């Protein structure tokens, strides 16, 4: 029942803005993409994402955001995958335009189709090898284009529903794009997104922890086999999860015993 009222509150907060955004911004920018820069399309989308997350009382706690600010160039973002809103959280954090590679099946959803047009999502066909070759080239070109998007990939290939301290296997193919584009690779650890839309969890604030590790330069991984590099990144993210979960427990414990809004110095403020 609480979740039901939460959804009602969210709808009341953001539905008018969403409708206005869709009919007067999204459709216009999709139909005349050539008139709107990637940055403008992205920033409008990002603003709406932030409104939606705020409506759900999401609190994003970020560590290592300075690595994004200091990146200075395009990068490949590799993150573990624990919730359906993982991409939205990264969009909310990143002022720099970022798009994502996702499985083709998601393109059947109306919302995803619209987002694909807006921020140039790359949908991967896992069954067709020839299509995969074309899609890999698209991902490489996306990173190489100085005016284009950064690229986010979830190398586990699916959401990890086990929610333990170990990530699923990081597919070697996810890092090969970095080799081909000669791009810096940014390892990212995400935790807490699975609670936001779940019926099993009800919190006054939903903490989401995101940690950015130091980018890995092409010169530092060019001689490492892709499978080994993917495993190294997986181990680092798994290690981060152990520390993040301790912070998460503390946050939730404090939330249960305090009626006041909890603020952390490390909290990311929109």
For the regions a language model picked out, list residue spans one by one:
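A transmembrane-helix-recognition feature enriched in membrane-embedded lipid enzymes
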Residues: 1-61, 114-115
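Non-catalytic C-terminal accessory region of glycerolipid acyltransferases
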Residues: 4, 133-270
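Catalytic core of membrane glycerolipid acyltransferases/transacylases, capturing the structured
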Residues: 20-29, 41-42, 55, 70-129
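Hydrophobic alpha-helical segments typical of transmembrane helices
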Residues: 48, 86-89, 111, 173, ...
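Short glycine/serine/threonine/alanine-rich loop segments
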Residues: 58, 121, 182-183
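A short beta-turn/loop motif at secondary-structure boundaries
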Residues: 66-70, 202-203
């Amino acid at each position: 029942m609480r979740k039901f009222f939460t959804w009602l509150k969210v709808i009341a907060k953001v539905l008018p803005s969403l409708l206005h955004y869709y009919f007067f911004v999204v459709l216009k920018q999709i139909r005349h993409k050539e008139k709107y820069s990637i940055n403008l399309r992205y920033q409008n989308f990002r603003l709406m994402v932030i409104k939606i997350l705020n409506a759900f009382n999401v609190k994003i706690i970020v560590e290592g955001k300075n690595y994004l600010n200091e990146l200075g160039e395009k990068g490949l973002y590799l993150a573990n995958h624990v919730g359906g809103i993982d991409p939205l959280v990264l969009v909310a954090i990143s002022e720099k335009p970022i798009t994502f590679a996702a499985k083709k099946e998601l393109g059947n959803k109306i919302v995803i189709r619209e987002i694909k047009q807006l921020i140039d999502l790359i949908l991967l066909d896992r069954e067709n090898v020839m299509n995969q070759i074309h899609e890999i080239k698209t991902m490489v070109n996306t990173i190489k284009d100085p005016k284009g998007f950064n690229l986010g990939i979830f190398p586990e290939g699916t959401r990890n529903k086990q929610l333990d301290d170990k990530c699923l296997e990081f597919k070697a193919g996810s890092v090969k794009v970095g080799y081909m584009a000669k791009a810096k690779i940014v390892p990212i650890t995400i935790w807490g997104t699975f609670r936001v839309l779940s019926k099993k969890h009800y919190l006054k604030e939903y903490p989401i922890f995101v940690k950015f590790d130091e980018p890995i330069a092409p010169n530092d991984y060019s001689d490492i086999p892709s499978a080994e590099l993917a495993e190294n990144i997986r181990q680092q993210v798994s290690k981060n999860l152990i520390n993040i979960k301790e912070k998460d427990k503390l946050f939730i414990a404090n939330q249960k015993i305090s009626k006041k809004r909890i603020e952390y110095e490390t909290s990311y403020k929109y």
